Amino acid sequence: MIRTVIKYFFSLLLLVSIAHANLNAQNLTGIWRGNFITESFDHYKFEIQIKQNGSSVSGVSYSYLSTIFYGKATLTGVFNKSGQNALIKEIRTVELKMAGNQGACIMKCIFQYEKSGNEEFLEGTFTSKYEKDGNGVKKGGNCGGGKVYLRKVTTSDFYIEPFLRNKVNPVKTPV
């Protein structure tokens, strides 16, 4: 009887240890693509390419609608493994194409990491602020917020950053 209890206890301890190791082994490095929806229900495509080093993340983001709007920004952030959440902030835009003289906005995203089968997701909220003064807007002024939905993918709609090369599949070109 005691041997059975001890075997059961050690089996349970082993399962808990394996589950805990898998949780702590989570790595966000890769390409995450989806969209963000503003408070006024405008939909934009959104892709981030990130590299995780410990709890720190860095990389680039792409916000795009069509040929009318496209922006690329550098980003930094932190991933809390125990809470399975991430805070990611765009630092500055490095490429920008916009119609008119609208001001560019940089985003701050708060994500929750979820896994369902083999699929991985980052979902959460964002706030944004104007990056520069101009056209009636002040640097740091409120650009609005909304919701963000991303799924980890193996290909990019854009140039794959050097820090991700050999870690993901290249963009597939039509034949």
Can you name each region flagged by the protein language model?
Residues Q26-P174:
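Central antiparallel beta-sheet cores of small beta-barrel/beta-sandwich binding domains
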Residues M1-T29:
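Bacterial Sec-dependent N-terminal signal peptides
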